[in-house]
Amino acid sequence: ITHHFGGIVPMLEGRIGPGWDQLGARTSDEDLSLVLKRLKKRPLDYFKHDFYADTAVFGGVPATHAGLAFYDLDKIVFASDCPFDPEGGPVFIRESIRAIDSLKLTQPVRNKVYYGNALRMLRLSLTAAPAAKSAARPRRK
């Protein structure tokens, strides 16, 4: 999972793509032919389609928009950098939700980002929690 929507990668797609496409072509001291033979697609395509990205960009709407446009929607997972904010967690959670909800996303896409992709990636299922037992516990004085 790339943190912070992959950092600057979505914003530098136009540079990273051609730059990595030339891997080894402009370096005189390294033989990268083995690396190039193992790549089955453009290096940029690994970022876009194989990496997961989290939404921890502290509520930045432009960064959220860029990340959603760059990565496959099935590879984006909600994150907030909690508890590292001035309130110990709630600010970044709240602002991340605000940023995502400010964009024109369908509810199914929001569901993927908020929990669906993480459930699939972690091979978990969304099931109802078992009912809590109502046995009374003695109160401490």
Where are these regions (language model features)?
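Aromatic-lined glycan-binding groove of carbohydrate-active enzymes
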Residues: 1-50
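Mid-to-C-terminal alpha-helical segments outside catalytic/metal-binding sites
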Residues: 7-8, 32-34, 52-77, 83-141
